[in-house]
């Protein structure tokens, strides 16, 4: 576990959240706000006022929040480029599946590029959406580079959630819907962070609502923690992590300004800590994948470990604090989930 306090934290410099995407999402078939799960036992154990978990394990027919960003980015792009016939995206799994799903809904083709170490279950889920699947001989960043080349072809659109393109910005705007659904106020928000698009949306919410936002990253892919410490986007080596959706070497340029100003600090967790959190949530009847469970692992470290004292003080975490955990995904790799929790994915989870 590593903790970083952001020396450049300045919520007044954060952009306001987009309100336009929520109206669009509400028009989609099957849209409903995802549930907020209270965790009173955890709050009592850690000496906090309240803890709640935003459960993104079932969002518009998919097991992750990513469809909020992908659907809005595609909608905005097609308004400008109605001639597009193929959507292209690089992904560690969830974003690609979301883009493929949106393509199928809109009668478009999809070409999804995945890194070599992507799990077979995630590949199969994307293929099941009808997409052309390309496994790149390299890491996530190699897939991103190939997607940019493929997306530049005639009739193609790269739906990127990283970089500085229009879609990369619209993805951040689309994620605002997750936070506009909250019906209560929180003091501290812990958000799993890969390239930082969701964390940027969280930062916008936090700046508006007066909540401190903490980024949660894998120890093995802590590109935002490195960037906050350096004061500039910093690429890191990524040897691999079970938190596949967070296995990113650099933050998105579209997200960076709001991350730098709006993230109070960061906590890194390792795979063992994320898996322990998965087991804890499974015991409560909540089927949450590695990336989503990382938020719980980070809260435990933040609330109890001596090394986290500077960040605890910076965000004012204490007996009256109301804490929100963003559980970004359900089990997207069933075999890995079973190995981590000792059981198959719960059905009809609370």
Tell me the role of every PLM-derived stretch.
Residues 1-350:
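PLP-dependent amino-acid enzyme catalytic core
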């Amino acid at each position: 576990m590593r903790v970083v306090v952001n020396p450049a934290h300045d919520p007044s410099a954060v952009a306001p959240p987009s309100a336009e995407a929520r109206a669009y999402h509400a028009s989609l078939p099957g849209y409903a706000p995802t549930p907020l799960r209270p965790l009173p036992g955890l709050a009592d154990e850690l000496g906090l006022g309240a803890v709640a978990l935003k459960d993104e394990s079932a969002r518009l027919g998919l097991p992750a929040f990513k469809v909020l960003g992908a659907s809005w980015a595609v909608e905005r792009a097609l308004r400008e480029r109605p001639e597009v016939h193929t959507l292209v995206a690089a992904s560690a799994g969830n974003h690609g599946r979301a883009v493929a799903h949106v393509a199928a809904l809109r009668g478009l083709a999809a070409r999804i590029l995945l890194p070599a170490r992507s799990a077979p279950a995630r590949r199969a889920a994307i293929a099941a959406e009808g997409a052309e699947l390309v496994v790149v001989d390299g890491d996530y960043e190699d897939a991103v580079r190939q997607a940019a080349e493929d997306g530049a072809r005639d009739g193609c659109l790269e739906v990127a959630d990283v970089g500085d393109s229009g879609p990369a910005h619209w993805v951040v705007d689309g994620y605002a819907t997750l936070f506009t659904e909250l019906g209560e106020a929180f003091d501290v928000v812990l958000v799993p962070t890969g390239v930082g698009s969701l964390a940027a949306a969280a930062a916008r919410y936090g700046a508006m609502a007066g909540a401190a936002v903490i980024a949660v990253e894998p120890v093995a892919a802590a590109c935002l923690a490195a960037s906050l410490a350096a004061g500039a986007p910093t690429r890191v080596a990524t040897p691999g992590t079970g938190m596949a959706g967070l296995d990113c070497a650099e933050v998105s340029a579209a997200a960076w300004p709001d991350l730098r100003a709006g993230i109070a600090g960061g906590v890194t967790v390792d795979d063992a800590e994320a898996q322990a959190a998965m087991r804890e949530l499974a015991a409560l009847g909540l089927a949450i994948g590695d990336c989503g469970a990382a938020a719980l692992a980070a809260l435990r470290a933040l609330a109890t470990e001596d090394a986290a004292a500077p960040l605890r003080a910076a965000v004012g975490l204490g007996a009256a604090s109301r804490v929100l955990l963003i559980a970004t995904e359900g089990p997207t790799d069933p075999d890995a989930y079973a190995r981590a929790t000792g059981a198959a994915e719960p059905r009809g989870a609370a």
